[in-house]
A protein has these predicted regions:
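Charge-rich, low-complexity N-terminal segments
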Residues: 1-57, 63-118
C-alpha cells in the first residue's frame, strides 16, 4: 500500500534532511529547473520525502495536479531522476546527495475511502 502502512520511527536527522530535500524539490519543480521532457513539473506536488537511516536514499512521494496520469508522471520522474538529482545537487550542500526513488502518493485516495466508510 502507500505510505500509511509504515510504522517506522525516523530520527531527527532523517526528518530534517527529508524536509530539506522536500522543500528544494518543490522549488525545483515550480521553477522547472530539472527540464524533464514531456512533463510540466509545475504541476507536481511533493507531499513527503522519507530518508533511509544512512541518508543515501530518499523515497519521494508525489502527486500530479490537473488530471495528469499519476503512473505516467512517476515513471517519467523515475526515468529522468538523474536530471532531477543533478538540479538538486546545485541547490543542496550536503555530504551525500541521496538517490531519489519516486513513489505515487495514494494517501488522499486512502483518506477518501475512509471518509466514504464513515
Amino acid at each position: 500500500m502507500g505510505k500509511q502502512s509504515s510504522q517506522r520511527v525516523f530520527s531527527q536527522r532523517q526528518l530534517r534532511v527529508g524536509e530539506l530535500v522536500k522543500q528544494n524539490l518543490g522549488e525545483l519543480f515550480i521553477r522547472n529547473e530539472a527540464k524533464i521532457p514531456n512533463i510540466n513539473s509545475k504541476l507536481i506536488t511533493v507531499t513527503e520525502v522519507r530518508m533511509t537511516p544512512d541518508l543515501k536514499t530518499a523515497r519521494v512521494y508525489v502527486i500530479p495536479l490537473g488530471g495528469i496520469d499519476m503512473r505516467e508522471t512517476v515513471s517519467a520522474l523515475t526515468e529522468y531522476s538523474h536530471l532531477v538529482r543533478k538540479a538538486l545537487s546545485k541547490r543542496l550542500d550536503i555530504k551525500f546527495l541521496p538517490k531519489l526513488t519516486f513513489v505515487e502518493d495514494n494517501s488522499f485516495e486512502y483518506a477518501e475511502k475512509i471518509e466514504k466508510i464513515i
